[in-house]
Amino acid sequence: MERARRLAYRGIVKRLVNETKRHRNGESSLLPTTTVTPSRYVSSVSSFLHRRRDVSGSAFTTSGRNQHQTRSISVDALKPSDTFPRRHNSATPDEQAQMANYCGFDNLNTLIDSTVPKSIRLDSMKFSGIFDEGLTESQMIEHMSDLASKNKVFKSFIGMGYYNTHVPPVILRNIMENPAWYTQYTPYQAEISQGRLESLLNYQTVITDLTGLPMSNASLLDEGTAAAEAMAMCNNILKGKKKTFVIASNCHPQTIDVCKTRADGFDLKVVTVDIKDVDYSSGDVCGVLVQYPGTEGEVLDYGEFVKNAHANGVKVVMATDLLALTMLKPPGEFGADIVVGSGQRFGVPMGYGGPHAAFLATSQEYKRMMPGRIIGVSVDSSGKQALRMAMQTREQHIRRDKATSNICTAQALLANMTAMYAVYHGPEGLKSIAQRVHGLAGVFALGLKKLGTAQVQDLPFFDTVKVTCSDATAIFDVAAKKEINLRLVDSNTITVAFDETTTLDDVDKLFEVFASGKPVQFTAESLAPEFNNAIPSSLTRESPYLTHPIFNMYHTEHELLRYIHKLQNKDLSLCHSMIPLGSCTMKLNATTEMMPVTWPSFTNMHPFAPVEQAQGYQEMFTNLGELLCTITGFDSFSLQPNAGAAGEYAGLMVIRAYHMSRGDHHRNVCIIPVSAHGTNPASAAMCGMKIVAVGTDAKGNINIEELRNAAEANKDNLAALMVTYPSTHGVYEEGIDEICNIIHENGGQVYMDGANMNAQVGLTSPGFIGADVCHLNLHKTFCIPHGGGGPGMGPIGVKQHLAPFLPSHPVIPTGGIPEPEQTSPLGTISAAPWGSALILPISYTYIAMMGSGGLTDASKIAILNANYMAKRLESHYPVLFRGVNGTVAHEFIIDLRGFKNTAGIEPEDVAKRLMDYGFHGPTMSWPVPGTLMIEPTESESKAELDRFCDALISIREEISQIEKGNADPNNNVLKGAPHPPSLLMADTWKKPYSREYAAFPAPWLRSSKFWPTTGRVDNVYGDRNLVCTLQPANEEQAAAAVSA
C-alpha cells in the first residue's frame, strides 16, 4: 500500500507541476487541469490572475496613441457588479472551453447539442418582466424586503396546531442559519454524520419520553400527513381486513381532510363523528383518531375510550401537543397505539405553514410498520458506540411498492431545532413554559367570566379557550382592527390559543376586545392570583421525562453553543467539499437565497391568517408559480406538496381525479420502469394503482417495445406512466417523445418525476416533451438545502386539462397558480395551504437572480461537469451508460462490479475510503447494484471536480495493489476505511499499511482534512440489537467501560 500511496502522490503532483508550467507559458491544454497550487485553497492573488471571469476586454477605450490621452469608460463597466450567475455557476468561460475540449468538443454548446436530443430541444426560455435578465443580489434583497413589508403580522391566537414560539437565538444562528447544518445530506454515510445522528436520536428521545411510547421516527412532514401515515398503519396492522377509519370531530380540520384524501387510495372509508358518538358495531373499523388536547381546547380523559376501542379490536391514534404533554398525562399511559403531532412550538417558527418536524410514536410491536427514517444505536469497527439509520429495509428505496410509506427523509433540520430547544430548556424549563402558557389561558378565561359578555367552555383546557357569544364575527372584526387574529369557528364560537410569546399585556388587549366597548375594571396581572390550575389531577402528568443528562446539562448559551458545534464538527457538509450524490443535486445554497427565511415578516405568519395580511407571500407565490410554469412548460402549479414524495403522490392523485371525472374509474394501471426511484412505485401504491414494471435495454433506455406491449395490453385500464428524464441511468433517452405518445394513444397520462430537472431547465421542459404532470424537487434543482434530511418541497405543475384537480385546503381555499377557470380539487395533500411556505423564498430568489440565461447556463455547466468527470475517470472505471453520441447527462454511473471478483472490493468500501480523502461517497448501488452514481452539479469548481477525480483515481490504484497481490484482500486500506483519529492515535497499530497512508492518501489533505469520527458502523448489529433512544446514563457508562 505504500507503493500505491507513492504512485498516487507522484501522479497528482506531476500533473499539478505540468499545469503550472503551461500556465506560465500561456499554453492551452486539452489535458484536465486544476488550480495552480496543490492545495484546494487558492490565494486571492492567484485566484484573480488565473480565474478572471466574464472579462472580454478592458473596461476602458483609448482615444489616442499614448497613455496620456483621454480614455472613456464603457457602459458595461458601469452596470451592477453583484450579478449572481457568475457566483453560482463555478466554471469560468475559459474553464468551460478547456473541459469541453477535453471531452472532444469545440465548445460547450457543441457538447450540449450532441447530448440533448434535437427533437425535444427548446429554442430558448424567456421570463417576463424583470426576471428575465435576473436581479442582482442587492436588488433581490431589496425586492424581498419589499415583499416582506407587505406581510402584516398580527398577534396570533389562532392555534390549530401552529403557535408562535421564541426561537432561541443560539439555535437560530447556529443551526437554522448555519450552512454546516443545513447543507448536509441525509445521513446514509453514518461515519461522517454522527453529529446530526446524535441530535436526531435526541429528537426521538424527546418524542418517546413525552408521548409515553417507546418508538419514534426521526420526523415526518407535518401533523396532518403524520395522522394519514398512522391511518395507513392501522390498515396495515389489521392487514386490510377492516376498511373504516373513524376520526373524532375534535381533530384539526386540516388533519381530517388530509386523512380523507389519503384514504381514497387505500379504499378506506373515513367517518367523522363527535367523540361521544363513535360506534364500532359494524365490526369494520381498523382505527380511530382523536385530538389531545382537542382542536377547540378541551382536554378529555381517554382512558375508557381507549379500553372500549381495544375491546372492539380497534387501534387508537392520538394527535397531541408536545408542550401540553409536559403537564398532561401522556397518551401512552392511556394505552394509545400510535401518537402523532408536530414539534413546531418547540422553537421552530410558524413560517406561514412550515417547514416543521412532525412525529409518529408507537410500540415496539409495530416498529417495522412505521414510516420514515429511524435512528438507531450500533457499534463501529472498534466496538465503540456509533449511530446509524435503522431498519432501512422497511423503506421505499428498498421495498418500493411494498414499502410502509413513500416518505423519504422529511424534516431533519427542523427536528434538530426541536431537539436543541428541548436540550436548551430541559424538563423543568419546558414545564415552566407550559405552566406559563396555561396560566395565561386560565387568567383570560377567568377575566371573560368576570366580564360576562361571553361564555367560556367548562371543560378542562391547556392553552386554548373556547368562547361562545351572540356575534362571534363582530368580536373577530374588533380584534382584527387591533391587529389580533382569533379563530372564528362559527357565528357563535371563537377559540383563543395562547403560546410562549403571549404576555400579560396581550391578555389585557383581549379583555378590551371582548368587553364590547365597556370599561374593563381589572387587569390580567390583578387576576393572576385568583387562577387555579384547570387540569384535573386525573389528567396531570406524574411520570418523569427527559431525564438523560443531555437534557440537563446545556442550559446556558455557552454550553449549548459548544454542544451544537461539537456535533457540527462530526458531520461533513458542503462547507467541506462537494457531495456528488447522483439524483440528489447537492448544489450551492447561496447566502442571499437563505437570508429572507429568518426575517420576522416571513417567519411569524400563521398559515391560517387572512390572506389579505399575507400579500407579500401571495405576490411571491404568484410570481413563483408563473416562473415555474415558464420553466416547465405547464399551465398551472400547486405549491402545497411539501416534499418530493408528497409531490409524486399529489401528481398521481391529480391524474386519478381526472380519470374519475371522465367516468374512467377503472383506470388504475401505472407503468413504471424498473430503474425508477423507489418512491415512484410506493407513491403509485398509495394511490391504489396497480403497478406494471417495464425493463430497460443494454444502453439503459426504457425498452420501448416492452412499454408499447404493456400499454396496449392495459389500454382499457391504463392510468399513467411514471418516467424520469433524463433517465435515472444518466442519459437523455432519444425516444422520450415516442414514449409519451404511446401512453397518450392508450388513454393514459404521463407523470414525469422531476428529480433530474437540473438537466432540463432552459434546454427542454416536461411540458414540451409531452408530460401531463411533473413534480419539482425544489431542494434539488432550485437550491433549497437538504438540511441533513429535509426540509424539501415538491410542487406539481400540470397541463391545462389537469389544472382543475389541483389540491385545495379546508381552512384557506387554494388551487392552481395561475388559477384555472374551473376547479374540482382532489382534496388536501398537506396540513398547510401552501406547504412549507417559509422556504419558498429560497427557490424564488435563485430563479429571480439567475434569470433565464443564468438558469440555462446552469443546466449546460451541470452537463459539462458530469461529462468532464466521466472523461477523466473512464480509463480507470467503466462508465456504464452513455447517450447516442457518447455523452452523459448531468450525472453518470461508474461500474465497480468487477472489483468484487478481482479484489473483493464493494462500492461500500470505495465510499468509506472516500471519507479518508474528505469526500462524501456518491450514490451507492442504485439504480444498478455494484455501481456508484456521480452528480457534480454546476456550482462545483473545476478544481473541486479534479480533486474528487484525483481521489477516485488514487483509490483505483489502491484497488490495483490488491489485484496484484501487493495488499491483503481482507485487511487493506479500503476494508479498513474510514480511519478516525481514535484509531490512528491508538497505542497499537496492527494494520499492514501505515497510519500516515491511512490518514493522508492525497497531498491536499495535509493543509485541510475532514476527519470521520467513528470507524465503519456495523449495520447488522444495529438492527439485531435495536435501540432508538438515548440509553440511560449508567448503561452508556457501562458500554464505554466495556469498549475501553
Swiss-Prot record:
The modification N6-(pyridoxal phosphate)lysine is found at K780. Its main location: mitochondrion. It catalyses: N(6)-[(R)-lipoyl]-L-lysyl-[glycine-cleavage complex H protein] + glycine + H(+) = N(6)-[(R)-S(8)-aminomethyldihydrolipoyl]-L-lysyl-[glycine-cleavage complex H protein] + CO2. The keyword Mitochondrion applies. Its cofactor is pyridoxal 5'-phosphate. Expressed in leaves. Detected in roots, stems, flowers and siliques. GO terms for cellular component: chloroplast; chloroplast envelope; cytosol; mitochondrion; vacuole. SUPFAM superfamilies: PLP-dependent transferases (SSF53383). The keyword Transit peptide applies. Its EC number is 1.4.4.2. Residues 1-72 form a transit peptide. Keywords: Mitochondrion, Oxidoreductase, Pyridoxal phosphate, Transit peptide. It comes from the Eukaryota. It is found in: Mitochondrion. NCBIfam families: gcvP, PRK04366.1. Belongs to the GcvP family. PANTHER family: GLYCINE DEHYDROGENASE (DECARBOXYLATING), MITOCHONDRIAL, GLYCINE DEHYDROGENASE, DECARBOXYLATING. This is Glycine dehydrogenase (decarboxylating) 2, mitochondrial. The gene is GLDP2.
